[in-house]
Every structure is written in C-alpha cells, then in structure tokens.
Amino acid sequence: MGQVATEEKRPTSVAELPGVGPSTAAKLIDAGYGTIEALAVATPEELVAIGIPLTTAQKIIRAARQMLDIRFRTAKEVKLERMNLRKITTGSKNLDDLLGGGIETKTITEFFGEFGSGKSQLCHQASVNVQLPLEQGGLSEGDKVAKAVYVDTEGTFRWERIEQMAKCLGLDPDQVMDNIYYIRAVNSDHQMAIVEELFNLVPKENVKLIVVDSVTSHFRAEYPGRENLAVRQQKLNKHLHQLGKLAEVYNTAVIITNQVMARPDVFYGDPTQAVGGHVLYHAPGVRVQLKKARGNKRIARVVDAPHLPEAEAVFAITDCGIRDPED
C-alpha cells in the first residue's frame, strides 16, 4: 500500500514561525508584530529594539518573507496586481474619475487644503462608503463587512455626519457606526502608538480603510522652529512609513489629511503649499489639493500621482455628503 504524500504544514501564526517561542511571540504581539504579514515587512533593527537578538530577528523575518512569497516580480505581474487593486467610491463620479476610479487600496492618499475645503467631509464619507458592497463602490464582500479606523487629531469627527450620510445611502446608521473604530490622538507619540496597534486590529477586524485627520497637526505643534525640524521630520517619516506598511501588507486604503501654509516668496500662481516638507511630498501615493469654490462646490486637483495625470474635478458637499454638483 503506497504512502499518501502530504504537503508540508505552513505556519499560519507568529507563534509557529521557526525561532519563535512563547516569550518571543508575546514580545512580538505586544509590539504590534502579531501577524506574519507585519513581520515580513519589519527590519531586524526594529525587532532588536523590542529585545529580540539580532540573529533570531533575521531568522524570523526571513521565515515570514518566505511564507508570503516576497520575491522579484515581472512588470507584467505588477500590472496585473495593480489592475486588481480595490477602490472606494468618494460619492462623486467626477472625483472618482479624477482618482482613477476612487480611493485605492495599498496606497496612502493625501487630501490637503485650507479650512473648510472638504478634507474631513471626504474622510467621513469614505468611512461610510467603504462598508458598501463591492458592486456599489465599497469593499464589503458577502457577510464580511469592510470596516474603518478613524484617527482624529483635531476633534473634527462628528457622529451626526456619519449618521446623515448612512441614512442617505439607505444604510442602518447604528450598524455603520459600529463598523467605524474611532480614537482621538492626544499627541504625536500617542498617534504613532495607535498606528503601531493597528497591525493587530486591521487583520482581526477586516479594516479596509484607515483615516488620519490630520496627520501633521501634533508634529507641528510639538516640534516648532527650525531647531526641531530634523526630529520632527524623522518622527513624521517613521509614522508615514508605518501607515504605508499597513496599506501594503493588508491591502487597505489609507487617507491622510494635511493643512496648508502660505509661501511669502510666491508672487504668481497658488501661494499655498502643504505642510510637512519633503517627507510628505514623497510618502503618499496620491496627493490631492482641495480648494473652495462657489457655494457648496469644491475643486480637487491631483498634484502628484505616478499613475494619474495632473487634472482637476469639481464636486459638491451636500446634506447627504460628497456628491457631483447639480449644475
């Protein structure tokens, strides 16, 4: 009687990886490395910082990457991957078209503009829309509801607005609010710690949208002046890097909002620019400037995206949320 060949059992949790005992697993989970995906994009130095020996850290990361088949891909494979990215509708066809179909997963999308330009409105709308079925522009599949995390740094979140937007879409407002995890970040360290914790929450709760509104306010307030610029940019860079990891590893959309400041040296054209310096110029995959227009209309302009042309679109902020203008 012949023997039946069996496939080698592949690790499905951090505790099953080679070199990971109970105490090491506890350290990894406490530090936000509770999944194989999170370990695969970690660096040995990051694991050493939480008390894991360098050789063990290298072994763990190597094993995690093998499990996820992290390797070189052909350009054609990359094309197919990008074509399969999911997108969340903004509620406005004009704006969706500008963004190439909506707010895409595996990407940080930055909306920046002056007060009242619609940044937080878009964040609220996306937090509702992500819960829609795929065929309606959301990321929910069957009984698996896509959820959102809303990190609020300026106190701009309004549950009343979520309720209003949900009702207009024919959704149960209480269910919609149950699927949005809200947290108020009180300072930059707290903000960074929240994002670290998301490496555990995102896969566990099927979070498909992470909102940070706004990403720069605490960093600017706590590190003013040129003498603190290097420290501020270093911390902000690490924060954005972690958000990018979350987007990539868990196929999640990330929206960050940002403020603008006036440039006194600009005499022609738009004298405003997003705050955050070069760190924020390069971290987001899509950067969109928002401007006020007449009445409830707003103008969105793509200023940087490798796959999108520089272009503008007009959308409206209505009682029901983000929509196309009526005229």
Swiss-Prot record:
Organism: Ignicoccus hospitalis (strain KIN4/I / DSM 18386 / JCM 14125)
Lineage of the organism: Archaea, Thermoproteota, Thermoprotei, Desulfurococcales, Desulfurococcaceae
Descriptive protein name: DNA repair and recombination protein RadA
Organism domain of life: Archaea
Annotated CDD domains: archRadA
HAMAP family per UniProt: RadA_arch
One of the record's GO molecular function terms: ATP hydrolysis activity
NCBIfam families with a match to the protein in the record: PRK04301.1 (NF003301), recomb_radA (TIGR02236)
GO biological process: DNA recombination; DNA repair
